[in-house]
Amino acid sequence: MLKIFEKLFGSKHEKDVKKIQPTIQRINELQRALASLSDEQLRQKGRELKQKVRGVLEPMELEQQKLFHQLDSPNISLDEAESVNNKLDDLAVAYETATASVLEEILPDTFALVKETCARLKGHTYNVMGRQFVWNMVPYDVQLIGGIVLHSGKIAEMQTGEGKTLVSTLPTFLNALTGRGVHVVTVNDYLAQRDKEWMEPLFAFHNLSVGVILTSMHPALRRAQYLCDITYGTNNELGFDYLRDNMANTPEEMVQRKFYYAIVDEVDSVLIDEARTPLIISGPVPNADNSKFQEIKPWIEQLVRAQQQQIAAWLGDAETRMKTNATDPEAGLALLRVKRGQPKNSRFIKMLSQQGVAKLVQITENEYLKDNSSRMHEVDDALFYAVDEKANTIDLTDKGRDFLSKLSHQDSDIFLLPDVGTEIATIESNAALSTNDKIQHKDALYRLFSDRSERLHNISQLLKAYSLFERDDEYVVQNGQVMIVDEFTGRILPGRRYSDGLHQAIEAKENVKIEGETQTMATITIQNFFRLYKKLAGMTGTAETEASEFYEIYKLDVVVIPTNASVVRKDMDDLVYKTRREKYNAIAQKVEELQKRGQPVLVGTTSVEVSETLSRMLRTRRIAHNVLNAKQNDREAEIVAEAGQKGTVTIATNMAGRGTDIKLGDGVRELGGLYILGSERHESRRIDRQLRGRAGRQGDPGESVFYVSLEDELMRLFGSDRVIAVMDRLGHEEGDVIEHSMITKSIERAQKKVEEQNFAIRKRLLEYDDVLNQQREVIYSRRKNGLLKERLTSDILDLLKDYSDTIVKKYHKDFDTAGLEEQLMRDLSIEFQLDRATFEREGIDAVVDKVYETALTFYRRKEESLPADIMCQIEKYAVLTVIDQRWREHLREIDSLREGINLRAYGQKDPLIEYKQEAFRLFITLLKEIEAETLSLAFKLFPIDPEEQQQIEERQRQSAIRQEKLVAQHDVAESFVGLNDDDEPLPAQPITTEQKPGRNDLCPCGSGKKYKACCGQ
C-alpha cells in the first residue's frame, strides 16, 4: 500500500530533494558569476562573507563576556546573580537563532564560492599521506544537495563513490565562518589524517585553518588543533578529550572549546554500531588482587572439560537414537542440553544441518519453555553450567557448584550468595546480641556477601572467556596482549579492554600477563557525547534502514541523496548451503573461476578466523590473493588500492568500514566490474549493504552475491528454522545449493530480528545513562566553575550559610551545645562557645547567624593572613579534590547498582525505575558530602611552614611507595574500560598543618585519600 502512495505522490526523500532544487539553481548561477573574478577577488568574497557573520555574532559575544564578568564579582548578591543568569540564558537562545539565520542567508553565496574554488584547484598536485594527488573534484548538483542536507542538521545517505568527503567541505566551510569551530568526525586516525590533508588546499585558499586530532598527540598540540576553524578527528579521541578536560586540574590542561557543529562520516558506524560501548577513562584499583583468576583457572578448565565430555556423550546418544527414530524425544532432550551447554560445538552445528534435526531441537525447546520456562531447569540440572548465547550469559548450576566445591575442598555453600535482607532481619531480632555484636555480625555478613559475589563473578567471567569468546574471532593475541577486534570493521582496537574483569579472564585463559584491575574515573556514552553539540549531521552509504533509530535517539532526519550516475550493479539472491565446508569449497571454486577470466573479486568475511581459513584454501589452489584483517591492518591502503585491478583477489574482514573507494583498473569494466562475494550474512543489513556498495561506484558495473550456510552464526541463532524446513521438503542433498528470493527474504527477516534486539539494547543503555548524564552535567558544571572562576570565596560562603543552618538544626532539638561546639571544631577548626540557656532562649535563626558570623570572621582572618594567589589555590584545590574523589566513588557505586539492578525484576519491580530512584538517592548524598567536605577543606587547609617541609616530604615518599602502582597505571584508560591518557604531573598542592586529623578527614600528605586509608593506617 505504501509503495502505491509513493508512486502516486512521490516518496519522502524525493520531496526533500525537490524542496532544495531552487537553491541549487541559485548556487550554480552565483558560481558562474564568480568565474570571472581573479583569485584575490575570490578570496575577498570569502573575507566579506566571514565579516558578515562575525558582524552579527561579535556584539552578542561581547555582551556575553560582560555578563560573565558581572557574575565573577565578589560583591554580587544572589538576586543579582539570578538576574544575570537569566539574561545569559536569553542571550544564548538569541545567539543560536542569529547564527542559524545569518548562515541560511549566505548559504548560496558560500556554496557557490566553494564550488568555484574547487574548479580553480583542478589540475593542481598535492601530497596526501605520502602520495601525489591531482585535484579533479568539483561538486555535482547532487553533492550540493548533500551539503545543504548536512548544514540542516540531517543525515545524508549517499552511495559509495559519490564523494561524501567533498560534500562535507560545503557545510564545513559555511559553519567555520562563525569562528566557533567545526568538527569532522571519522572512524579512525588514518581517515582523519587523510581527509584533513586531502581537503586542506580548499580551506587554505581562503585562509581557514585546519587541524587533526590523532591518538597519542600531546595535550598542547591537541589544544592548538581544536583552536583551528576546522578539526578532523575520531569519535573516540573527541570523546576522551571531553572526559579528560573534565578531569583537568588547571585551565591550561583543557584542550577543547565549546561544542558547536559536528559532521560524522560513516554516521551509522559511529552513532549506532559503537553506541553499545560507552567511553570510559579508568585508573587502577588500589590493592587489587590480580592473581584471583589464576587461582580459579585450573578449576574452571576441569569444569569445562567435564562439560565437554558430557556433551560428547549426549551427542553420541542422540545420534544412536535418531538412527532408529528421527523424532525420539530423548534424542531431542540430549541435543537441547548440548545447545544449552556448548552451543558452538562443531559436531552439534553439523548435526543441525541434517534433515529434521533442527526441527526436533526446536520442538523440544518449545516444550520446556512452556508456562514461562517452568521446566527448563530439568534441562539445565544435568549441566555443570548453562550458556545463553543470545543473552551472552552463563549460569552455574547446582551440579557445577558441587563439582567446584570438591575441587576446592570447600563446602558448596561458598558458591551461594547469602540472603542479606533475611540475615539482617535475623540479626536485628536476636535479643541476645548487644548493639556492638549486631554491628560486628552485620559487617561479617557484608564481607561474606562481598567475597562470595566476587568469587562467583570471577567464575562467570572465566566461563564466558572459555565458552563465548573465541581467539581470532572476538579477539586476537599479539605481542603477548589480548587485543579486541571490532565486530563491525574487523579492525584491532588498540588500548581498549573489556570491562567487569572479562578482559583479565581472557588474559588468564590465553596465558598472557594479566593487567591490573581498573575502576571508572569518568564515563559517557557515544549518544550523550554527541548530544553535546548544538548542531549534528552525518553522512553514510547506509542509513535508511536505521532511520527510525536516528530520529528517536538523536532527532536526526535521514535524506536519501540521488546518485550522480545510475547504479548498474547486479545484486543476486543468496546461495544457501547446508554446511560451512560445502560453502567454503563453493567460494574457492568461484574465486578460481573469476580469477581465470581476470575479473577482480573482493571476498568479505565476518571474522579473522574465516578470512584465514579461506586464505589457506586459496593457497592450496595456488590462487594469488591479498588478505586484509585485524592482523594485516598495516597494509590497508595498499591492498585497497589494488583491489579493483584485473585478476586481483582480496579477502577482507568486514570491508564495510574501510572508508576507501575501490577504483577499477584497465579492462575491468568489460569483464563486469568488481565482483563482491560475501562469505556469510552479517547480523546487520547495513553492513551487507555497505559490502555490496563497494562495487558499482559512479555508474561502474559490478556484481554481488552472498554465500550462506545453515551453520553460520546468524542462521544458527536467529533464522534457520524456515530455511531448514524448505530444504527438508525439497530433499536437499549434500553439496546442493538453493538460490531463491524467498530464502533471501527469510535471511533478511533474521537480520531484522537481530537489529531489533540490538536497538533495544542501545535504547536501554541510553535510558540508564540518561540518569547518570543528568548527574554528570551537574558535577562537571560545578567542577568547571571551580576550575575557571578566578575567586571561589562567594561559593564557599554560600556553602557556609547552608552548613550553618543544617548544623544548628541538627543540635537544636536536644540543645546539645557540646555536640555543636565539637562538630564546628572538627569540621571547620573554629572555636565556638554557646551555653545551653542561650541556645534554648534564642531562636534557631539567631544561633545560625552567630555560627555563620563566627566562621566568617575566621575565614576573613585567614584571607588577610595569606597572599591572594595562595588563598585562590586553596579554594580551587578544595573544590576540585573533593569533587574528583567523591565523583569516582559515586561512579563505583553506580556501577555496583547497575550490576545488580536487574535482579529487582524477580520482585515484580521495573529495574529502570528502581535504578532511577536509587541513583537519585545516591546523588543527593553525593552532593551533601561534596558540599560538606569542600567547606571543611577550604577552612582547614594552610600552606606548610618551611621547617615542616622535610617531614612532609618523607611522609609523601612513604605514601608514594604505597601508591606506586596507582601512579604507574593512573594513565591507563581504555574504552570498554578506557584509553591511554598521558596526564602531566600535578603541581604541588597546599597541605593542612592541623595537629591531629580525624579518621574520615582528607589525609594531610596531599594524596587526596581519607586519613584512615592513607597515613593513618
UniProtKB/Swiss-Prot annotation:
Protein residues bound to Zn(2+): C1003, C1005, C1014, C1015
A GO BP entry: intracellular protein transmembrane transport
Cofactor: Zn(2+)
Membrane spanning residue stretches: none
UniProt binding sites for ATP: Q143, G161, E162, G163, K164, T165, D661
EC number: 7.4.2.8
Catalytic activity: ATP + H2O + cellular proteinSide 1 = ADP + phosphate + cellular proteinSide 2
Protein name: Protein translocase subunit SecA 1
